């Protein structure tokens, strides 16, 4: 059995995409979607065994469940009375235009307890737990994030957190091993500007002081900043002119999780993350990419140590 990565993704989504097939005809595609789904997909592609934990229910859940079954992942889903969330994207113009959304209703207290216990049990069987946000963001009580991280770490499982505040703040209380966030999420955490390099460095230190073992701050097309208590790096992936950035961060997290689960150190893991994010960009896909392409791009990812 490959090393396991548990992915906490409270609300997997049904994604519907409209694309132009020809001059007078369209294509409509349905696929499993959401941050956790995309993380799990890349983790599986890079040789890990993902365990996806989340809710499923309602009419859209009936459509979504067989699509989730196509993932190379173990599913540990909790039934809920609420329908799974759905979005519709129109790509006929060449751009990704969101035209409709219908998010899930908040789960009950008992359903939340069921998902929490299922996730902790899975995490204790795994090398890594990834904690992702749900849609809507306020669907769960915030303390669940810190409790998941604390219980997983107490059992010897590494933890990766990809959340916006205030969920991020609660996860930090649990002592997360690795925090991945964008510079705008860092700005939310700081309640201050996080666009200038010095502000980002100072903000990353604040995240470490709040309980993280390592923090990565992505900055769109600029190099990402990675910081631990004693080292700081810039991650510079290859740049390409044509592609789509949606899902690149989730591909990066999936690769990070797979690498850490397989025993790689932080430096190797973040380089794998950079290569996976670049691969996702080339494919216009959310959490997609082949292991061969990621491996081919890996030598082109630069990790440069800088002053903290």
Regions found by a protein language model. Name each.
Residues 1-22:
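Positively charged, low-complexity intrinsically disordered leader regions
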Residues 19-39:
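Short catalytic helix/loop segments, enriched in acidic residues and glycine
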Residues 40-49, 258-263:
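Alpha-helix C-terminal capping segments
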Residues 41, 86-90, 223-226:
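Short beta-strand scaffold segments in enzyme catalytic cores
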Residues 99-100, 126-134, 162, 180-183:
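Short beta-strands and strand-loop turn motifs
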Residues 143-232:
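Conserved phosphate/ATP/ADP-binding segment of small-molecule kinases
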Residues 169, 197-308:
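Conserved phosphate-binding/catalytic region of the ribokinase-like
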């Amino acid at each position: 059995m490959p090393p396991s990565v548990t992915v906490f993704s409270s609300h997997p989504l049904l994604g519907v995409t409209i694309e132009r097939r020809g001059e007078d005809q369209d294509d409509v595609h349905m696929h499993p979607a959401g941050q956790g789904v995309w993380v799990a997909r890349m983790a599986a592609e890079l040789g890990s065994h993902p365990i996806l934990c989340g809710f499923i229910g309602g009419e859209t859940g009936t459509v979504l469940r067989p699509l989730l079954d196509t993932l190379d992942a173990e599913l540990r889903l909790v039934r809920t009375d609420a329908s799974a969330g759905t979005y519709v994207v129109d790509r006929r113009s060449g751009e990704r235009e969101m035209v409709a959304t219908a998010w899930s209703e908040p789960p009950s207290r008992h359903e939340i307890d069921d998902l929490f216990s299922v996730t902790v049990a899975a995490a204790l069987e795994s090398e890594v737990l990834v904690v992702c946000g749900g849609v809507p963001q306020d669907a769960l009580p915030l303390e669940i994030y810190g409790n998941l991280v604390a219980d997983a770490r107490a059992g010897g499982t590494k933890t990766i957190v990809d959340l916006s505040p205030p969920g991020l703040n609660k996860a930090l209380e649990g002592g997360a091993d690795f925090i991945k966030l964008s510079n705008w999420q860092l700005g939310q955490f700081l309640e201050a500007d996080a666009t200038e390099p010095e502000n980002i460095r100072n903000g990353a230190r604040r995240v470490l002081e709040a309980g993280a073992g390592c923090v990565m701050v992505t900055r769109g097309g600029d190099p990402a900043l990675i910081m631990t208590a004693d080292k700081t790096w810039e991650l510079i992936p290859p740049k390409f002119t044509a592609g789509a950035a949606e899902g690149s961060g989730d591909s990066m997290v999936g690769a990070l999780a797979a690498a850490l689960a397989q025993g790689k150190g932080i430096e190797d893991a973040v380089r794998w993350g950079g290569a996976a994010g670049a691969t996702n960009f080339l494919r216009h896909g959310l959490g997609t990419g082949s292991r061969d392409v990621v491996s081919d791009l890996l030598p082109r990812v630069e990790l440069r140590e800088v002053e903290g």
